[in-house]
Structures are given as C-alpha cells and as structure tokens.
Amino acid sequence: MEVGSIREKIIVALLIYRFGEANVETEIPITEPEVDVKSFGHPISIKTITGKGLAGVKLIWTVDAQKAKEFCENYYPKCDMLLVQVNWNDTGGFYYIPLNVQKRVFDKLSRKNYIRLPRPGTNPRGVEFTKEALSNLVGDSESRNILINWQRTKIEFNPYKRWVDLWRKD
C-alpha cells in the first residue's frame, strides 16, 4: 500500500509544480473513497500501474470479499482520473480521463463489464477495472495522454543510512 501512496505523492508533486501549491489541495483524508487530490477544486483519482499492458488497475484496495462486493454494487465514477503507466525501459503513459468519459464508458459497458471482482478464494488485493473498460477509457477521444519513455537509472541509495547517522549523533 505504501508503494501506491509514494507513487501518488510523486504525481501530486508534479501537479503542485505545474499549477502551484495554492491550486492543489493535498489534505484529503485517506479514507475518502476515490479522491486522492483536488486541483483547482476538482477532485482527482490517481491510479498507477507498472508493466507493458493496461491491466490490474485497482478501483479499490481490499482483501475483504464482502467489502469488494458492496463496492461493486455501489460504485459509479465520481471524479476525474490520472492514470500513470510505468513501463521501465520502454514506453508507458500519463493519461487524463475526465469524469464524463468514465461515466459514458461505465454506462455503455455496464457494471459487469466495467468492474472485475476478485475471484473467490484468491488474494488479489482489490477490485479492478476490466481490460475492456481501461481500453475504452484511454482510447476515448476526450481522454488525453502523454507517452513517456521510462528509463530506469541506477541510484545508490540506502534508506537506513540517514537514520543510522542521525542516531549516531546522539
């Protein structure tokens, strides 16, 4: 879960850089469903995926089968979405999917073909968009994208060193 939160923070930092701190609201409760940030007062959901294909993007993270079922029964898109596909050493993208596109695709495909529930007895960690839904969302003429060539660079980093050094000072 922390990996997702860190990825979201990187995207939010990009919004702050581009639009200014005054126009990006970051104090959104973690319990707020779907909304990760507000830009110019508009709620935005941030989704990230790593890999070549647009599959496995979570609508909600949960291992509780009942909670997943309830979410599926009650879900309807409620905010714009930023979808970031990281495809290391290859091309991925940064997609903006407006709320009206999500609603249109949801209504066209139906709940059953938009949402993929976890299979009983597995531990997939959440409810996902179907591949068909994602394909329709990113392919819509009103959605926008920036293709990104993701190059992984080697960074020597020890996350414990800073703290060990600080403890040594005391």
Q: Would you name each region that the model predicts?
A:
Residues 1-34, 38-170:
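Nucleic-acid endonuclease domains
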